[in-house]
UniProtKB/Swiss-Prot annotation:
Protein name as it appears in the record: Large ribosomal subunit protein uL3
Record's keyword annotation contains Hydrolase: no
An example molecular function term from Gene Ontology annotations: structural constituent of ribosome
Function summary: One of the primary rRNA binding proteins, it binds directly near the 3'-end of the 23S rRNA, where it nucleates assembly of the 50S subunit.
Source organism, top-level taxon: Bacteria
Originating organism: Allorhizobium ampelinum (strain ATCC BAA-846 / DSM 112012 / S4)
Pfam families recorded: Ribosomal_L3
Length: 213
């Protein structure tokens, strides 16, 4: 098991493959993704690497974090993520991960925070059909209707799909294909859509279920 990378979502575009077919892709950019620390079994009880990406202003960095960055001999980072790895995949502190970490054709799992939509009704949030247009229905055409409660159990069950805050949740999209990489510009082109807004931080890992596909 090897480390993933921290990337920044640039946006979507399309490219043409060798067969002349256009493929919708999301462009992810690696911005100084470096190893900040190691976690070892002897010292921490597990093996992992801590990565940092982007650039943070020194004035916005705590004194403790400035010490960590200085120990790793790297500039302050805007985003930090820890990846569990096998012992033979530990990397030296300060080493940089580039777009060549992945290769065209392989499958990856991409994690990001979805775009927030604010307070949304049941029709938009859960794709409910709504109530009837007429025949006794007034004002509440787009409501979710009954919540299914009676004297017994006398409550609304947890997880009941209702109106509420939509988006702004952590989502992982699995088995996306890497169309191509550009190591000089630090770009990874992934087939399809990726959760998150432009400029948001994205975590890219080797797909865990690729063998099943």
């Amino acid at each position: 098991m090897r480390s993933g990378v921290i990337a920044q979502k640039v946006g979507m575009t399309r490219v043409y493959n060798d067969a002349g077919e256009h493929v919708p892709v999301t462009v992810l950019r690696l911005d100084n993704c470096q190893v900040l620390a190691q976690r070892t079994v002897d010292k921490h009880g597990y093996t992992a690497v801590q990565l940092g990406a982007g650039q943070a202003k020194v004035k916005n960095t705590s004194k403790a974090m400035r010490g960590n960055f200085a120990a790793a001999n790297v500039e302050p980072k805007a985003k930090l993520v820890e990846f569990r790895v096998s012992e033979d995949n530990l990397m030296d502190v300060g080493s940089e991960l580039k777009a060549g970490h992945f290769e065209a054709g392989q499958l990856v799992d991409v994690t990001g925070t979805t775009i927030g939509k604010g307070f949304a009704g049941a029709m938009k949030r859960h794709n409910f059909g709504g109530l009837r247009a007429t025949h006794g229905v007034s004002v509440s055409h787009r409501s979710h209707g009954s919540t299914g409660s009676n004297q017994d159990p006398g409550k609304v069950w947890k997880g009941k799909r209702m109106a509420g805050h939509m988006g702004q949740t952590r989502v992982t999209t699995q088995n996306l294909e890497v169309v191509s990489t550009d190591e000089d510009r630090g770009l990874i082109l992934v087939k399809g859509a990726v959760p998150g807004s432009k400029g948001s931080w994205i975590i890219v890992r080797d797909a865990v279920k690729s063998a099943a596909k």
